[in-house]
Amino acid sequence: MPRSVKKGPIVASHLLAKIEKQKNLKNKKVIQTWSRSSTITPIFVGHKIAVYNGREHIPVYITENMVGHKLGEFSPTRTYRGHNKKDKKIQKK
C-alpha cells in the first residue's frame, strides 16, 4: 500500500542535509548512503548518490524520471549469474 499523501515522502534527514550542503557547489561529490528506503524528491535531481546494496555502494545518478521512486530500486541486492548451460535435464535426447 502506498504512503498517505498528507504524511509526505520518507527521506532520511542526514541525506537531505548532505544534499543541501552540495546544492550550490560546482564540483558535486558522491554522497554515500545506507538509506535504501528514502524516496527520491526533486531536490535530489542532478546529484550522484552511492546506495549500499549489502556488499558495496553503487553510484546512482539521479534524473527527473526517478522522482517518486525509492533509492533501493536502483541498487540491486542480488546477482543473477544465469542458469547452468550443461544441465542434464535439458539435454535429454
Curated annotation (Swiss-Prot):
The keyword Plastid does not apply. Residues 80-93 have a biased composition (Basic residues). Pfam families: Ribosomal_S19 (PF00203). GO terms for cellular component: cytoplasm; small ribosomal subunit. InterPro entries: Ribosomal_uS19, Ribosomal_uS19_bac-type, Ribosomal_uS19_CS, Ribosomal_uS19_SF. Keywords: Ribonucleoprotein, Ribosomal protein, RNA-binding, rRNA-binding. One of its GO terms (biological process) is translation. The keyword Ribonucleoprotein applies. One of its GO terms (molecular function) is rRNA binding. Residues 73-93 are annotated as: Disordered. HAMAP family: Ribosomal_uS19. Belongs to the universal ribosomal protein uS19 family. PANTHER family: RIBOSOMAL PROTEIN S19P FAMILY MEMBER, SMALL RIBOSOMAL SUBUNIT PROTEIN US19M. Protein S19 forms a complex with S13 that binds strongly to the 16S ribosomal RNA. This is Small ribosomal subunit protein uS19.
